[in-house]
Amino acid sequence: MRNSYDVIVIGGGHAGCEAAAAAARLGATTALVTHRFATIGAMSCNPAIGGLGKGHLVREVDALDGLMGRVADAGGIQFRMLNRRKGPAVRGPRAQADRKLYAAAMQAAIRATVHLSVIEGEADALLSADGRVTGIRLADGREFAAGAVVITTGTFLRGLIHLGEQSWPAGRIDEAPALGLSRSFEALGFALGRLKTGTPPRLDGRTIDWGAVEMQPGDDPPEPFSVLTPAITTPQIECGITRTTPATHAVIRDNVHRSPMYSGQIQSTGPRYCPSIEDKIVRFGDRDGHQIFLEPEGLDDPTVYPNGISTSLPEEVQRAILKTIPGLERTELVRPGYAIEYDHVDPRELEPTLQTKRLRGLFLAGQINGTTGYEEAAAQGLVAGLNAVLAAGGGDPAVFDRADGYLGVMIDDLVTRGINEPYRMFTSRAEYRLTLRADNADQRLTDKGLALGCVGAERAAFHRTKMAALADAKALAQSLSITPNEASRHGLSLNRDGQRRSAFDLLSYPEIGWDEVKAIWPELAAVSPAIAVHVEIDAKYHVYLARQTADVEAFRRDEGLLLTEIDYAQVPGLSNEARNRLERHRPRTVGQAGRLDGITPAALGILAAYLRREARKRPATVSGER
């Protein structure tokens, strides 16, 4: 085994796998350090990928030739497009996954990645010199040199599990925590915080009364995450839906003092949008019930994940809770739910590349940055892995901004605003969500991936073919036109203004779809259904996209005004509050400054004017020197 790598990635979860694979795709010699190869790709909490906002991230990871989309397609056992009744911008692909199939597919993908080696062991310390990371030391004493290191430790940094009145050190159930790395961070001056997350009990599906619960099928046919997946071939299953009852709530209220969150045992903050069942009852006491999704964990595994009742109440209380829920009265508990606390780094310690400001060559991704969720972790891992290679090799950084994708929105939120609770992606966080749709992730990002060199030959060829077909189909739809009188003969009611309208124009009407225009122009039948969907969505959003393009151009103008070397004490007109905030956060651009709390439009105007004055001075200085 070699003892030196271009990039070392610590942690084999969702962030670590994407980071390691991305680095290796760029040709870097890469090592993935994990406790055991068998735990690579493990789904620590819910057996599902995607969802609202999260599904966008999976599609964006796929567009950059990442792994998660293809692995989810291989392991998915129920696919649903959430928000299907709403517009395409807020629809979210989601898949229920077979835990074993998902992990096996991820492990196979890691094995097949050229330039990537796996080292089994516990990373115990970071090695550095002259303000730059130089490698790592394992708990067994082995040392490995690296040009860059990516840390993706999930909940393992000083992880502490809580179950009722009991607590014990662990990274997740039955796995040891990572203690040495926390000490390394503290020695380097990083301020560590504590966050909390939780998981529900696991149930024996053979003891559930499935006849007493509502059943929810998936989409037919299922829609894959990856553009490279022609069709889903794994057998599909149904999930169940039940609800808590007033009796459930009474059990929880009677025992809430035994919950670590309410006994004072846990002081850290949990995810607002994924609260424990005891938190739901305390915060929403007027509700008569809370929905629970019964999600099978595998095709040949009877274990069921009851999504919606995350808890750290004592095991006997969890059993009592289950007896009050329709369909679960006689269910057997496979494993109790629990809460886990872990260390995280303030993400404002990071550059938009996810490199730390304190130590060059050190990158962080996933829950260590204060996020929650597999998809958020995967997207960060991919960005960190790409930039680790570029930093180690002296290349230009790969920065994704808020107009590029949800991954850019997330990273900008983290490094600009920081977090005070685990960060979860939602479509509402994106200003340009009409542009940043799940259906066009490859159209937005694959060309950028090709320029970076992280997209392989198969995807590159597929992308070129698809984009050519899309351009041809759109041109065809724009070339075919009809008058209002002609349209009326086909059953379409248009404004009788004498204006000819193209097939593309007609598709912008809410009530007109591809089938209607194809009935008028049979030549449109030659367009594949997959391409037709894109043309129709583009037509529906055409007017709005033109407006949003102007907004994006204004955003990018502000992002182009760099603030990196400004002495804010020399900027006249800034309030002391604004000056202090700008000095503390050191935003890279005027646009980023505007996203800081407490920075007013007036302060931004002062900064922009100052930059213009300084820009006018520089040419005069050069001329004088000559």
Curated annotation (Swiss-Prot):
InterPro entries in the cross-refs: FAD/NAD-bd_sf, GIDA_C_N, MnmG, MnmG-rel, MnmG-rel_CS, MnmG_C, MnmG_C_subdom, MnmG_C_subdom_sf
Cofactor(s) required for function per UniProt: FAD
Residues the entry annotates as binding NAD(+): 270-284
MF-aspect GO terms: flavin adenine dinucleotide binding
BP GO terms, sorted: tRNA methylation; tRNA wobble uridine modification
GO cellular component: a single term: cytosol
SUPFAM superfamilies found in the cross-reference section: FAD/NAD(P)-binding domain
Database matches in SMART domains: GIDA_assoc_3
Role: NAD-binding protein involved in the addition of a carboxymethylaminomethyl (cmnm) group at the wobble position (U34) of certain tRNAs, forming tRNA-cmnm(5)s(2)U34.
Complexes and interactors: Homodimer. Heterotetramer of two MnmE and two MnmG subunits.
Name of the protein: tRNA uridine 5-carboxymethylaminomethyl modification enzyme MnmG
Provenance organism: Rhodopseudomonas palustris (strain BisB5)
GN (gene name): mnmG
